[in-house]
Amino acid sequence: MPTSETSWWPGACLCSSCAWTSDSRFFNLWTLGLAPAASQGFSGLKPQTDDCTVSFPGFEAFGLGLSHYWHLSFPACRQSIMGLCLVIVLANSS
């Protein structure tokens, strides 16, 4: 059974030409890994996700995921918002 979990949630907003991406509340939610939950409030965001899980000696699981969202509400703003999450669950060492 895993005893501790370490998570790293870097994020980036890649739509610099659109004013709505400068909203720090959205960026902070993305960097905390909460964008998929928060995007339910953004009806114009269409999520697409890919992920995989790999095992290494000394680790219970190592997960790597890539998510990106297309903002569909603004025709001039069809660029994507992308983020990368890395989750490492450590195995019990005792």
UniProtKB/Swiss-Prot annotation:
This is Putative uncharacterized protein encoded by LINC00575. Specifically expressed in retina and retinal pigment epithelium. It comes from Homo sapiens (Human).
